[in-house]
Amino acid sequence: MKPVFKTSDLAIDKTGSVLVTEQLQKLIDLAAQNQGIALVEKGTYLTASLFLKSHMELRLEEGAELLGTTDESCYPVIPTRAAGIEMDWYPGIVNINNQTDVTVSGKGTINGQGEYWWNKYWGTDQTGGYRKEYDAKGLRWACDYDCRRVRNLVVMESDHITLKDFTSTRSGFWNVHVCYSSHVHVDGIHITACGSNSPSPDGSDIDSCE
């Protein structure tokens, strides 16, 4: 039986009022070192980007919510691929990059707090934000790339990945992005964009995979 490492083991704040990225990453690293399960228990966990490792499972208990912070300074800018272009951009809230044998499961939720990112793109009334500035310059095509937003879950250059049962909602950009990967099993995940003011809240984007 795989060892289980719980958020309560590390006394990680679950009120959603304190940023707990470092503590959650420590839990993930501990699970990976032991080829075990990082169990996020019921509660709300305010976080920036988390990076999963090979031979582990991230399990979101029912009632558990990973709540993406809207403080952009908390997100690193890394080489990635967004909307078909290689560029430096924000990673996801949950990331599986260059890993193998990783599972994300459970009845919990990844919540991107999309309203912040949507308003960044085109304001509260779809006539402002980056879009207004870029439209005025005749650069509509570039707005999607220059207006960095956060995806909820990114799988990049990885293999033998399972995504099962969790909910992805209110993503700042695409909800689930699987890119340059193989043997990815997606089963029973629930995706909601929420809101007519949400630009590019695609559900699941399978990009250059086999």
Q: Residue spans of the language-model regions?
A:
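Extracellular/periplasmic carbohydrate-active domains that bind, remodel
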Residues: 1-210
